[in-house]
Curated annotation (Swiss-Prot):
Keywords: Cytoplasmic vesicle, Hydrolase, Protein phosphatase. Acts as a phosphoinositide 3-phosphatase and regulates PtdIns(3,4,5)P3 levels. One of its GO terms (biological process) is phosphatidylinositol phosphate biosynthetic process. The active site is at C129. The keyword Translocase does not apply. The lineage of its organism: Eukaryota, Fungi, Dikarya, Ascomycota, Taphrinomycotina. One of its GO terms (molecular function) is phosphoprotein phosphatase activity. It catalyses: a 1,2-diacyl-sn-glycero-3-phospho-(1D-myo-inositol-3,4,5-trisphosphate) + H2O = a 1,2-diacyl-sn-glycero-3-phospho-(1D-myo-inositol-4,5-bisphosphate) + phosphate; 1,2-dioctanoyl-sn-glycero-3-phospho-(1D-myo-inositol-3,4,5-trisphosphate) + H2O = 1,2-dioctanoyl-sn-glycero-3-phospho-(1D-myo-inositol-4,5-bisphosphate) + phosphate; 1,2-dihexadecanoyl-sn-glycero-3-phospho-(1D-myo-inositol-3,4,5-trisphosphate) + H2O = 1,2-dihexadecanoyl-sn-glycero-3-phospho-(1D-myo-inositol-4,5-bisphosphate) + phosphate. This is Phosphatidylinositol 3,4,5-trisphosphate 3-phosphatase ptn1. It comes from Schizosaccharomyces pombe (strain 972 / ATCC 24843). Its EC number is 3.1.3.67. InterPro entries: Dual-spec_lipid-protein_phosph, Prot-tyrosine_phosphatase-like, PTP-SAK, Tensin_phosphatase, Tyr_Pase_AS, Tyr_Pase_dom. Gene3D superfamilies: Protein tyrosine phosphatase superfamily. It is found in: Cytoplasmic vesicle. It is an enzyme of class 3 (hydrolase).
Length: 348
């Protein structure tokens, strides 16, 4: 059983790297800081054959940390362990696997983490999703940026060092992007209220893809986070086949353009790009972005001080671009475009 768990958790560090009782050595959990633990999900039934046995997790927490622990469950999907076993020491902050949470929700999570530490100085927070990697890392890195004195880059490096035997801790571009959004919120906290109370809309005007592959058809769609129990993103708009789109050639590169004409009050949006064609297997890439914070992030990473220019991001026309490598799932197929540019206008 422990061999199977080791195979499933390969690449990630666990308590076997720590000096612990042998009975806990195969738990897939690790201390990122002395007060924050990253962990894959506890499990019952057949799932405990390859995940952390919920009874072993509970025994570790209660014997090593007494009652000074709280479990943060980030799984939006149905849990595979008995929540009742850990109550009242469990808080649910579920969001979809392989995705970031909405930005303001992410900020609320890290704010509550800090509040818990302020009221319970001996507390250890145990953060888990399914594998204890992507969603867990998004929240922990965001907390370290907001309250741990680290930059986004430093938090990502620390998480990789502490959590991984090989590879990177966070690999999904959208999750990494949202950690950087938190750094902007930390550096410029006055922006938070402006974004929270912004009731304006965003008018999406056009998309442009640079250097798309020949004989391929692109279909674009925009989605928003679901506000109900369904964890799947809600579709807002979808393009038609490439035959109705504008294709031009510039400097030997095919440029594909399309008008959008979508108005929405959503600020966190998912852009999905699907490729279809006679000579290609269907494939898709996507990215989450925030309509206010993405243009901020571009200027912030370029070293531009925009502290006095918040209104330019809350309203007015924006043009943002994502390279192929900045798209989620981009490593799973050969690039079918080089860069995608979105033009939209924020309106109060």
């Amino acid at each position: 059983m422990n061999i199977l768990r080791s195979v499933v958790s390969r690449g990630r560090k666990g308590l076997k790297q720590e000096k612990v009782n042998r009975s806990f050595a195969y738990l897939d959990m690790v201390y990122i800081t002395s007060k924050v633990i990253a962990m894959s999900t506890p499990a019952a039934g057949i799932h405990k054959l390859y995940r952390n046995d919920e009874l072993d997790v509970f025994k570790y927490l209660t014997t090593q940390l007494k009652d000074n622990w709280i479990l943060l469950n980030l799984c939006a999907e149905e849990t595979v362990y008995h929540l009742e076993l850990f109550k009242p020491n469990v808080i649910n902050y579920g969001f979809q696997d392989h995705n970031p949470p909405p930005l303001l929700f992410l900020w609320a999570i890290v704010m509550n983490m800090d509040a818990l530490f302020q009221t319970q100085p001996l507390l250890t927070l145990v953060v888990h999703c399914k594998a204890g990697k992507g969603r867990t890392g998004t929240v922990i890195c965001s907390y370290l940026v907001a309250f741990g004195g680290l930059t986004a880059k430093q938090s990502l490096e620390l998480y990789t060092e502490k959590r991984m035997v090989r590879g990177h801790g966070l690999t999904i571009s959208s999750q990494i992007r949202y950690v950087y959004y938190i750094e902007i919120l930390k550096q410029f906290p006055n922006y938070l209220k402006a974004v929270e109370f912004n009731t304006g809309t965003t008018f999406f005007k056009s998309f442009k893809c640079l250097n798309i592959k020949k004989n391929s058809s692109l279909i674009l769609s925009l989605h928003a986070f679901s506000k109900g129990r369904n964890i799947n993103p809600v579709a807002l708009w979808k393009s038609s086949d490439i035959s109705s789109h504008n294709v031009s050639i510039k400097e030997g590169k095919r440029i594909w353009g399309i008008q959008c004409n979508l108005e929405t009050s959503e600020k966190d949006l998912l852009l999905r790009v699907e490729r279809k064609g006679q000579f290609y297997f269907p494939s898709s890439v996507q990215c989450w972005f925030h309509t206010h914070f993405q243009p901020m992030l571009v200027e912030y990473t370029n070293g531009i001080n925009f502290q006095q220019g918040i209104n330019s991001f809350l309203q007015g026309q924006q043009s943002i671009s994502f390279s192929w490598s900045e798209m989620d799932n981009s490593r799973r197929s050969d690039p079918f475009f080089e860069q995608l540019t979105i033009v939209y206008e924020n309106v109060f």
